[in-house]
């Protein structure tokens, strides 16, 4: 049955921005990675870990954020998540050492991912069938474009600022999402909310972990994304330290590579019968 709710331009833009926060948080500061070890008196491996630990936070946040929104509605978890994401981003910008930065990056991923998973839930509140597919395709497009645009923006920011300013930009982006969360009208009425959503969700997670088919497919995804994130975390060091490219030149190379990934995804979908 098709949803009767009207999808406004605000909802479309808001959901797109919610979806963009995690790829922006991952890719915006990539051009700055090689200059960060010296400033924080640490090594490249620990700086690269700031990407991995944020990704871990994203994974945990999505496991919790979805059930929370099913139990308490979409609006409250969004507001709380975006407030905490603003704080985490500011903490990243003022981190005095690598230890504080790692903690802040984990919190940034944890809180930012709440908006990502709730954006998908809101999509289902407003649409179904083909309309839902079109809306989800739009959100996937945002997810695809963000890795192309983010390093380009980050590289240009480094022309007149430091890597710390990049996290201020992320804090500002989260603040915009926070304002949108206050404007957003709750899409899940109380009568449709699930009591004990978190406990039910974790029981379902336990069932999934016993499913061999699920585990097998998850391992395939794990290895695929493991290689992808190895490239993300190491590419800026290789391009800038070995090939002597500037931060801006690296961002162009990374953007071209991301375009290739998007093209491959499109061709892959068209090849499926």
Where are the language model's segments positioned?
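Conserved MFS/SLC helix-loop-helix module at the cytosolic interface between two early adjacent transmembrane helices
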Residues: 60-99
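Helix-breaking motifs and short loop linkers at transmembrane-helix boundaries and internal kinks
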Residues: 41, 73, 94-100, 111, ...
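Flexible cytoplasmic inter-helical loops of multi-pass small-molecule transporters
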Residues: 182-206
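Residue-level signature of mid-helix packing/kink "hotspots" within the transmembrane helices
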Residues: 27, 55-63, 147-148, 258-266
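Cytoplasmic helix-loop-helix junction between adjacent transmembrane helices
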Residues: 104-145
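Helix-loop-helix hairpin linking two adjacent transmembrane segments in secondary transporters
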Residues: 96, 100, 129, 135-182, ...
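Extracytoplasmic
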Residues: 10-44, 65, 231-236
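Conserved small/polar residues in nucleotide/adenosyl-binding loops
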Residues: 270-273
